[in-house]
Amino acid sequence: VLITTYNFKVEEFVPDRIKVNARLDQEQLKPGNTTQLLIDALNYYGPPAANRNYELEVQVKEKTFAPQAYPQFDFAISNRSSFFDKVVRQGKTDAGGKAVESWQVPALYANMGLLQARFFATVFDENGRPVSRNTTAAIQTQPVMLGIGAVGNSYYALNQPARFPLIALNTAEKEA
């Protein structure tokens, strides 16, 4: 007696052969600062992943500064164009399965608000299969963030004064 049937698919699963850790020596950066990404690759159940190809990719994007204590204020810089280059570097791990890459925050990122750098480290096993890890760092491009408050009106009469609340906060979200 057949009660029911069920269709299913079987996929081949190949676990990662190496373990990759990536960490930065700094979590907070400023324009002109240099940080180092430390990559550590180990073979599972074996020695360090020596002489393996790796790739580092650094992406910088805008990060929203939105303090919870001041939800009525907008801290965005709205009339600027974003231009963040993607950095890609390649190399080989040393005999201990380690690699170190330095990256300097460009000085031209000054006064661009709050940014975030994301570091993608990819190490390739002996068959060329990638194993990736990422880590992030905040880039504080200015010591004080200026916010303009919402007043609820989107239309103001011609030649009439309009009042807008302003606030200056440091990056710790305290009044400057």
Regions found by a protein language model. Give the residues of each.
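A structural signal for beta-strand and strand-to-loop patches characteristic of beta-rich domains
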Residues: 1-176
